[in-house]
Regions:
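A short, N-terminal "cap"/entry segment at the start of jelly-roll beta-barrel domains
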Residues: 1-63, 137-186, 268-269
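Conserved short histidine dyad/triad with adjacent acidic residue
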Residues: 48-55, 65-84, 174-177, 189-205, ...
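Glycine- and acidic-residue-biased ligand/ion/polar-headgroup-sensing regions
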Residues: 85-98, 102, 206-223
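Structural motif
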Residues: 96-98, 121, 130, 210, ...
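Short acidic-glycine-tyrosine-enriched beta hairpin
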Residues: 103-118, 223-239
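Ligand-binding loop in jelly-roll beta-barrel domains
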Residues: 105, 118-144, 239-265
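Surface-exposed interaction/gating patches
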Residues: 154-210, 214-220, 227
Length: 269
């Protein structure tokens, strides 16, 4: 249901050519590129490694970072983030763990979704199992008169899919934040296409995207290119990169999607 990198190292007999590409408008990091030797360790984390999928890059996607975290038994952190201006979303893909936000305990399992606002103190630990999750971070853009969002923990199964109109159920989005809640300046959703479902136009918009394929496969139109993607692949899109897709195969095509929302455009570079 939720694909996660397996690491390892390909055989010396395998060919090196895969589907990895970095362009002026988008990047694709296929699952075969997420090996042991490209992981990083992070300050104040024990028994943990991370695949860094995205970070702010000038002239590309500039608003967020995205990690895939693997916390081995007994690992975790009591000081997970070194940036006091960061807000976070965690999406658990495998294992079990324990989370504290401002002293309140929350059990975690596959499908758990966590929003951690700027200024919150949080800790995360795992005991006997390996905990795997996505960690998305963004500097919170505060606005006078608008309160900071509250922390919350939920689960995918507790949130209904909002189906797009006139798609006969082929395209829907699981939203964990009310789209009308202007306090939030980022959304992290799960988008689901049934086989044969499509984005029937080239989306071309200001929102940046981090798109991690959780399940299934599709053919994506990215800028001027058609790219085939499958579970475990990551697509990274800068603002205004045209995008559309056809979902294929025999199972739903599902991905975790980041986008920046609900704020004026900065007028200074």
């Amino acid at each position: 249901k939720y694909y996660f990198p397996t690491g390892g190292l390909p055989s010396q007999r395998d060919i090196m050519t895969q589907r990895a590409v970095f362009t002026e408008a988008y990047a694709v990091i296929p699952k075969g590129s997420m090996r042991d030797i490209v992981t990083s360790f992070l300050p104040n984390w024990d028994n943990t490694r991370a695949w860094v999928l995205a970070r702010p890059l000038s002239g590309f996607a500039e608003t967020f970072s995205q990690y895939i975290m693997e916390v081995s038994a007994g690992g975790g952190s009591t000081k997970p983030d070194t940036d006091p201006n960061a807000q976070s979303v965690l999406f658990i893909t495998d294992g079990q763990g324990n989370l504290k936000i401002n002293g309140v305990k929350h059990p975690l399992c596959a499908g758990s979704y966590v929003y951690i606002p700027v200024g919150a103190h949080w800790e995360i630990k795992t005991d006997a199992t390996t905990l795997r999750f996505h960690w998305l971070r963004k500097t919170y853009v505060s606005v006078d008169g608008i309160e900071t969002p509250d922390a919350f923990v939920t689960h995918e199964d507790k949130n209904a899919i909002d189906l797009m109109p006139d798609t006969n159920g082929a395209w829907g989005t699981t939203r964990f934040v009310d789209p009308d809640d202007i306090r939030h300046d980022m959304h992290v959703n799960i988008v689901t296409f049934q086989p044969g479902g499509v984005i029937p136009f080239e989306e071309t918009h200001v929102m940046e995207h981090g798109l991690y394929v959780l399940q299934g496969k599709a053919v994506y139109k990215l800028n001027q290119d058609w790219v085939e993607v499958e579970a475990g692949d990551f697509i990274w899109l800068r603002a205004f990169c045209p995008q559309a897709c056809y979902a294929g195969g025999s199972e739903p095509f599902r991905y975790l999607l980041y986008k920046d929302v609900n704020r004026h455009m900065p007028l200074k570079l």
